[in-house]
């Protein structure tokens, strides 16, 4: 038998729809959220001139280097290029000893902090007549803003041996005959003795004019 009782109708949702709101208020909220995100983000610290120089030398010659650590070879180059090594108070040996002392036993590189410690060690030797703080500042001035010196550029070398082999005016014998006075090669004439069968004496100024004179006299 069918249920004669009518089921109660569901109550209509009387909650009014949310209004889109004020566009200006929404824009202000987004602006505040953006400012909060920017404040929360950590800004990249600005590098000092000393650390910039450290990174330039740290990546020199190594495409995989990050610039955060420096090998002994680049450490020695930095000390040489920046004139920390003066050959008197600080030598290459001093630089190597300090590097071995500062780096870890199982490490082959030094960090920027260790780099600063190494400079303090060398500063005592480099500027003996200054206080510790002044000596460190002087060493920093030698390095700040510097970059590796690129070597290996080919330069023209002037030596007696090279000049003797390249200056054609100094050639003797058969080699001299291969070039004219300007140094230009004569080609085949400079390599082979060509026989002049014209009948004229070599050096005769009027060579080749006999036929013209005979024909002109007729």
UniProtKB/Swiss-Prot annotation:
Binding-site residues, Zn(2+): 60, 71, 79, 82
GO CC aspect terms: cytoplasm; cytosol; microtubule; microtubule bundle; microtubule organizing center; mitochondrion; mitotic spindle; myelin sheath
State its location(s).
Golgi outpost; Cytoplasm, Cytoskeleton, Microtubule organizing center; Cytoplasm, Cytoskeleton; Nucleus
The annotated region (Disordered) lies at: 1-46, 166-192
Q: Which UniProt keywords apply?
A: Cell cycle, Cell division, Cytoplasm, Cytoskeleton, Glycoprotein, Golgi apparatus, Hydrolase, Magnesium, Metal-binding, Microtubule, Mitosis, Nucleus, Phosphoprotein, Zinc
Q: How is it modified after translation?
A: Phosphorylated by LIMK1 on serine residues; phosphorylation may alter the tubulin polymerization activity. Phosphorylation by LIMK2, but not LIMK1, regulates astral microtubule organization at early stage of mitosis. Phosphorylation by ROCK1 at Ser-31, Ser-106 and Ser-158 inhibits interaction with HDAC6, resulting in decreased acetylation of tubulin, increased cell motility and entry into S-phase. Phosphorylation by CDK1 inhibits the microtubule polymerizing activity.
The tissues where this chain's protein is expressed are given as:
Widely expressed with higher expression in brain (at protein level).
Q: Which reaction does it catalyse?
A: GTP + H2O = GDP + phosphate + H(+)
Chain positions with Phosphoserine modification = 19, 31, 34, 106, 158-159
Q: Null mutant: what phenotype?
A: Mice display hypomyelination with shorter, thinner myelin sheaths and show breeding and motor coordination deficits. Oligodendrocytes have thinner and more numerous branches in proximal processes. Fewer microtubules are nucleated from Golgi outposts and these are no longer arranged in parallel bundles with their growing plus-ends distal, but show random polarity.
Q: Does the keyword Membrane apply?
A: no
Q: Name one Pfam family in it.
A: p25-alpha
Q: What does this protein do?
A: Regulator of microtubule dynamics that plays a key role in myelination by promoting elongation of the myelin sheath. Acts as a microtubule nucleation factor in oligodendrocytes: specifically localizes to the postsynaptic Golgi apparatus region, also named Golgi outpost, and promotes microtubule nucleation, an important step for elongation of the myelin sheath. Required for both uniform polarized growth of distal microtubules as well as directing the branching of proximal processes. Shows magnesium-dependent GTPase activity; the role of the GTPase activity is unclear.
Q: What quaternary structure, including any partners, is listed in this protein's UniProt entry?
A: Homodimer. Binds tubulin; binding is inhibited by GTP. Interacts with MAPK1. Interacts with GAPDH; the interaction is direct. Interacts with LIMK1 (via the PDZ domain); the interaction is direct. Interacts with LIMK2. Interacts with HDAC6; thereby inhibiting the tubulin deacetylase activity of HDAC6. Interacts with aggregated SNCA; may have a pro-aggregatory role in synucleinopathies. Interacts with DYNLL1. Interacts (via C-terminus) with S100A2, S100A6 and S100B; these interactions inhibit TPPP dimerization.
Q: Per its UniProt record, what PANTHER family does this chain match?
A: P25 ALPHA-RELATED (PTHR12932), TUBULIN POLYMERIZATION-PROMOTING PROTEIN (PTHR12932:SF18)
Its protein name is Tubulin polymerization-promoting protein
**Record organism:** Mus musculus
